Regions:
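Positively charged n-region of N-terminal signal peptides that target proteins for export
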Residues: 1-4
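N-terminal signal peptide c-region/cleavage motif recognized by signal peptidases
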Residues: 11-15
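N-terminal (or domain-start) structured segment
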Residues: 18-109, 146, 155-157, 167-203, ...
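Hinge/capping helix and adjacent helix->loop/strand transition within the periplasmic-binding protein
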Residues: 21-22, 50, 73-83, 97-185, ...
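An extracytoplasmic/periplasmic, membrane-proximal ligand-sensing/linker region
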Residues: 22-24, 261-324
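Solvent-exposed loop/turn segments at secondary-structure junctions
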Residues: 33-34, 90-93, 121, 130-131, ...
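Short, surface-exposed alpha-helical segments at coil->helix boundaries
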Residues: 38-46, 158-162, 232, 281, ...
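Short beta-strand->loop
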Residues: 106-117, 151, 174-179, 200, ...
């Protein structure tokens, strides 16, 4: 009986992992280096590789057009599990359909989406050289009529900017979003602001901005969403002044269209275990990242995609792009 049970267990394991990568996996990131999707994936890949030491992941940054360059590329790759993509939710599932609709070659659900690997609140930051020190002063600034630039590095960041402008009745003629190919160059632009060059304000994930906030290179004015950040107890929530700004940076693992079921299952099984791990929890605490248990499956991720679209597309579609 013991031999039979052992044989059944061995067989079940073999079936569960009938497929695994047999050559290096190319990991496409639609941002410049240092974005939240990249840093979260690198940590998870380290955890997965401890269980699968023969598996190698090679990150390839492919920035441009708010991830459209990367997403167009992944559409053309074989669905054999050796090329994956790390889309940002708001960009790939929502705002590409509004701001990049003329250059994208995919639908939001064209791909084989696997699971969400992490989320991070967005933070409104200011340069230390700015005279704006809090949310009330930022509100006054965006309605003052003076020229103001706000650095954004992705669809979620731009969405938060539009909500701030709408709720705060900011001057559309004076306050402009400045687009960067990812959050890292956006936060660096704020850190480099000197009154003439750089950008005075920015919006990006705190997971990316944290080192510069802690180092005093930029100042955190407020967080999006409803989660208080114990790592930053003195930073208020944007919703305290502008209700409804419930926007997060979020990232997932994605395969090319029509990926085989066993390939999807390998990524879902191994990366969901890594997301739930103690090692990742410690990393998340340090980097201000969280995850949703309900989004650790393809079906759960798809529900989130549809919810995002229902909530934000009607609002964002009303933006007048002719002024840009």
């Amino acid at each position: 009986m013991k031999k039979l049970l052992a044989l059944l267990l061995l067989t079940a394991t073999a079936v569960a992992f009938a497929w695994e990568p047999t050559k290096p996996v190319t990991v496409i990131v639609g941002n410049t280096p240092g974005a939240g999707n990249e840093i979260a994936f690198r940590k998870l890949a380290d955890i997965v590789q401890k269980q699968h030491p023969k598996v190698v992941f090679v990150v390839q940054n492919m920035p441009g057009a708010d991830s459209v360059i990367a997403n167009n590329h992944i559409m053309l790759q074989p669905a054999d599990g050796h090329t994956i993509n790390l889309p940002s939710h708001m960009s790939s599932y929502v705002t590409n359909d509004i701001w990049e609709k003329n250059i994208k070659k995919y639908n939001y659900d064209s791909f084989s989406d696997v699971l969400t690997i992490g989320k991070s609140p967005l933070v409104l930051i200011a340069s230390p050289r700015s005279a704006v020190n809090n949310l009330a002063e930022f509100q006054a600034a965006i309605t003052s009529g003076r020229p103001i630039n706000v650095a954004v590095g992705g669809g979620a960041h731009r969405t938060a900017f539009e909500y701030l402008m709408d709720r705060g009745k900011g001057s559309r003629d004076a306050v402009r979003p400045i687009k960067f190919n990812g959050p890292m160059p956006a936060v660096v632009s704020v850190a480099q602001y000197d009154g003439k060059t750089g950008t005075e304000f920015g919006i990006m994930p705190i997971a990316v901005a944290r080192p510069l906030v802690e180092g005093g290179k930029v100042r955190a004015l407020g967080f999006t969403g409803t989660r208080r950040m114990p790592q930053f107890p003195n930073v208020p929530m944007l919703q305290d002044l502008w209700p409804g700004i419930n926007v997060y940076a979020a990232w997932s693992i994605q395969l090319p269209p029509a990926a085989p079921r066993d390939v999807v299952e390998w990524y879902q099984t191994n990366f969901s275990a890594a997301v739930r791990s103690k090692e990742y929890a410690e990393w998340r605490e340090l980097n201000v990242v969280f995850y949703e248990e309900s989004e650790l499956t393809p079906a759960g991720l798809k529900r989130n995609m549809d919810e995002l679209r229902a909530a934000f597309i009607p609002v964002l579609s009303r933006i007048d792009l002719s002024k840009e």
